Regions:
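Ligand-site clamp/hinge motif
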Residues: 225-279
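Structural transition elements
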Residues: 332-368, 385-388
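Gly/Pro-rich hinge or "lid" segments in bacterial periplasmic/extracellular proteins
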Residues: 167-239, 246
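Long beta-strand-rich cores associated with HINT superfamily self-processing modules
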Residues: 504-530
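Alpha-helical secondary-structure segments
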Residues: 112-114, 118, 165, 235-236, ...
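Surface-exposed binding/hinge segments that line
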Residues: 132-189
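Extracytoplasmic/peripheral linker and loop segments enriched in polar/acidic and small residues
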Residues: 403-415, 440-507, 530
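N-terminal lobe/hinge region of extracytoplasmic solute-binding protein
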Residues: 40-90, 121, 203
Length: 530
């Protein structure tokens, strides 16, 4: 009996030990799987200034590691960040920022108004900074950039350690939106060229700090000095830089880890999936969509000697566009049919239809003098989404006319040269709104605008834009822009076709990932759940 009892006890001990060992193994497997969440960023920035090119993806690091006076929240609203309060003067020209009491660099030093001012000085001093001119609305900033005056003449003034005031040349209702761009996030500007070697000495101001830099990516973790550290995820995040859409997607969809010469581990979050795969990924519930700040337009050659210069041709194209149909075929999360020239809200009036009218299109094609111009030349900047859009357009055109359709793709610089030469009838144009100003697109048609791609000429239109720029009354400015819209609508020099949303691919079990309207990912709340 005693032996039986001893045997039974030993069996129980062995079983329990086995369970314990197995549990440890399971925990080990689980730990290795959830030790970090991997986000593939595609591009691999050389520095953390990130102001030499107007690109979006590399700014993901700025929004992750640094923070500015204000920021865009997860609902697309501009909210205080390092500043706790913003006071605007009655004339709308001066903005006073009251800093939070509990803001510190990751190294422990207090963040002061003087540090904010020093950042703006470094930012404006950088001759290679493509964003510097966006601060020309600040009194004295343009002169300082052009070395006409010194920084003491720039109206960025420290009142005390926690108060900084910025005065503008003219009222700009979108000034707060401008400085919400991640490029204005506080950092020691000009000292971040070799950040991968010097990451331990960087003074971070954002929700994360760089924990480690390895061959397989950058590892970031919570900034323990951040004023909202309680709300920031405890997850470690690995940021990788695999720049092939196809390879990234293949790894993202694998249920096991990858070990190759160019990548190890798995990918949980990815942007910029291949266009031809988005619909399938969407149908498999792997795509999340967020409001964007860009619109696709078809712009026409204004030369009346070309097909594009014939208003009947432009009316025909506007009539045949099957925006709703093709947006569904590409991916409804990525593209939504555009019904207005400006960024759309619930209050935006629908000016353009989202459905095609083949009979109306044929009617106006018959009015076009196309005998001398048998080809319809459609040009676009080379990328897969652009190619897909113009191919869909050509299908619609072929249903309404026997004219030959010639599609030509170019690099960005080549496209501009082709437009300057007038070697096109239609050009597909993507316009990125910097700060949701409804007048931003209208201003792009002014003769002095760098964005006036098609060299539109209309003195009446120019005068309206000039008056809108200096109109202090918001309601009057809105009326002026409505007049601009009427001119463009009547002449149909351009047609909005799609609003571009920001889409992200996220594995099941990864929650609370957000993307800003300008396309940057927010990871401070990301969680992996069972």
């Amino acid at each position: 009996v005693v032996k039986k009892i001893i045997f039974t006890v030993l069996c129980i001990i062995i079983i329990l030990a086995g369970i314990s060992i197995e549990k440890d193994k399971l925990n080990s497997v689980k730990y290795s799987k959830v030790n970090y969440i991997t986000y593939n960023m595609n591009v691999n920035p050389e520095d953390l200034q990130l102001t030499r090119e107007n690109t979006v993806r590399d700014k993901d690091l700025l929004i992750t590691l640094f923070e500015g006076l204000v920021k865009e929240d997860n609902n697309g609203e501009i909210v205080p960040a390092l500043a706790k309060e913003i006071i605007t003067s009655e004339d709308g020209l001066e903005y006073t920022f009251i800093l939070r009491e509990d803001i510190y660099y990751s190294t422990g030093e207090k963040i002061t108004a003087e540090a904010i001012k020093s950042f703006f000085k470094g930012f404006l001093s950088d001759r290679n900074n493509v964003y510097a001119s966006s601060l020309d609305c600040i009194y004295g900033a343009k002169e300082f950039r052009e070395e006409i005056g010194d920084f003491s003449n720039v109206a960025i003034n420290v009142k005390d350690d926690s108060t900084i005031a910025i005065r503008l040349n003219y009222k700009n209702p979108y000034f707060i939106n401008i400085i919400a761009n991640p490029v204005f996030n506080l950092r020691d500007y000009g000292t971040l060229d070799r950040y991968k070697e010097n990451f331990t000495s960087i003074r971070y101001t954002g929700p994360f700090v760089i924990k480690d830099v390895k061959n397989d990516g950058i590892y970031i973790e919570k900034n323990q000095k951040h004023y909202e550290r309680i709300k920031i995820t405890d997850e470690t995040i690995r940021i990788t830089f695999l720049n092939s859409e196809e390879n990234t997607l293949a790894i993202f969809e694998k249920s096991t880890e990858t070990n190759t010469d160019y990548f190890s581990g798995s990918i949980d979050i990815m942007m910029d999936a291949p266009i031809n795969e988005l619909l399938r990924l969407s149908q498999n519930s792997m795509v999340k969509s967020f409001n964007g700040s860009a619109v696709y337009y078809l712009s026409f050659n204004p030369d009346k000697e070309t097909v594009g210069g014939d208003v009947n041709f432009r009316i025909a194209i506007n009539s045949l566009l099957s925006k709703e149909y093709y947006s569904q075929l590409i991916c409804k999360e990525l593209l939504t049919p555009a019904t207005s020239y400006v960024m759309e809200t619930d209050e935006t009036e629908q000016v353009f239809s989202i459905f095609g009218d083949t009979e109306k299109a044929k009617e106006f094609f018959n009015k076009v003098n196309i005998n001398e111009n048998p080809e319809i030349r459609v040009i676009f900047e080379k990328n897969n989404l652009n190619r897909r859009i113009v191919e869909d357009l050509s299908i619609d055109i072929k249903e309404c006319t026997d004219s030959e359709i010639v599609l030509k793709e170019y690099s960005k610089e080549e496209l501009k040269n082709a437009v300057d030469k007038g070697d096109y009838d239609i050009v597909l144009q993507r316009f990125d709104f910097s700060y949701r100003n409804p007048g931003e697109y209208f201003e792009s048609f002014h003769k002095i605008s760098n964005n006036n791609l098609i060299s539109y000429e209309n003195e009446e239109y120019y005068n309206l834009i000039n008056s809108a720029k200096y109109e202090m009354n918001d309601e009057k400015r809105k009326i002026i822009y409505e007049e601009c819209e009427k001119i463009l609508r009547n002449q149909l020099i351009s047609i909005p076709i799609y609003n571009i949303n920001n889409v992200i691919c996220v594995k099941e079990g990864i929650n609370q990932v957000y993307v800003t309207t300008t396309g940057n990912i927010r990871l401070e709340k990301v969680k992996e759940v069972p």
